[in-house]
Amino acid sequence: MEWNGRKIILDNLREELSAYTVDIQDVVRSAILDGIELGSYIEECREYPWRLEQIRLLIKEDLKEEVGTDLSGAMLYKIRCLHREGHNIEGLKKLLASGMEDEYAEIALDWHSKGYELKGLKISWIPRHLLDIFEKGLMAKMDMREFNTGVAYDKEYLLALMRLQSDGKSCKLFVDGTWDLKVLQLIEAKAGNLRPNEWAELEKRLRKDMDLQQVSELINCCKQGMGLAWIGENDVYTAKHLGYIRKAFEKKLDWKKLVGAGKSLTEIEEAYNSMLTEKGRVLSGRLHKF
């Protein structure tokens, strides 16, 4: 075995490694007998002979390429046990990032053994209080990468995002975690059944400083089939203004006369009532003909 530019054999082992514990020397002795090169790991495992032993066994069992040797002895042992039990350990080296804490490495191993789709998922980024929810999502075959941002979401916030994704909606707008929870829950509850084109229009007009009533009216407009193309991307309408526009559409009035974010509410109310009165006159005139 090569170590520090010198050749270690059984005859000089104790002398060459006299600065190391007997435990380290015994592991090296076993490695020499197995024909395994452990020289590059001796110093880093000076205080951890059991880890050195696990590296030796990992190499002996031809698992080094799949797993790497950056993990703790405890994790290397668990991986060897998984392999011995017949689990597929392909891809573990990439999954178990260098320096990953044992807690996260253990979770990664558990999820891998359960067959969850983990490709592209950075498990060490998941806040501890969200690990159980992430597992539920993985179990349901959801794409949890969309929420793998490192943001410490409130649990209810993440659940609302997951329900949106389940409805086929992109959550990109909301994954920064800064939206009001009640607004997000309203969007998830009311907009989940919007068609793709309606959802795309709604996304363009949603702003995180909107209140519940404004967002609710925007969704109502979408559901009425009005679309939202008439709203400029930088325009902000009050909930009451949107409500008058929607009601005008429902009553088949010339609702586009009410469009314009700069119009005052008084102006909007007068225009709406005027159109309503005019429609009443027209209907009344038609009835008199009969």
Regions picked out by a protein language model, each given a short descriptive name:
Residues 1-290:
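General marker for long, soluble alpha-helical cores
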